[in-house]
Amino acid sequence: MFCNNLLLIIVNMKYSWVVYILCCSDGKLYTGVTNNIEKRVNAHNAGEASKFTRARLPVKILAASRFMTKEDAYRLEYRIKKLPRNKKLQVLKVE
């Protein structure tokens, strides 16, 4: 049930907002939005970003996708968060 090491990143620097999915140490998934993915993942691993990940350290980036607007990023985050785990993994093509 733990996440494998697959990392999918679509990078284009003109896009400033990132929707990311983290794999926690217990195999649970966490989805979020940021404008600085490196800083945000470091904050998660320092226990400073969310209560959910603080109890499940360390975390790894499983997937990330960049967007031009904050609104588009939050729309995708909302859609992903509504999905059950198996659907998230299907969307990401992760086992």
Please provide the spans of the model-predicted regions.
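GIY-YIG nuclease catalytic motif and its immediate N-terminal context
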Residues: 1-48, 54-66, 71-81, 86, ...
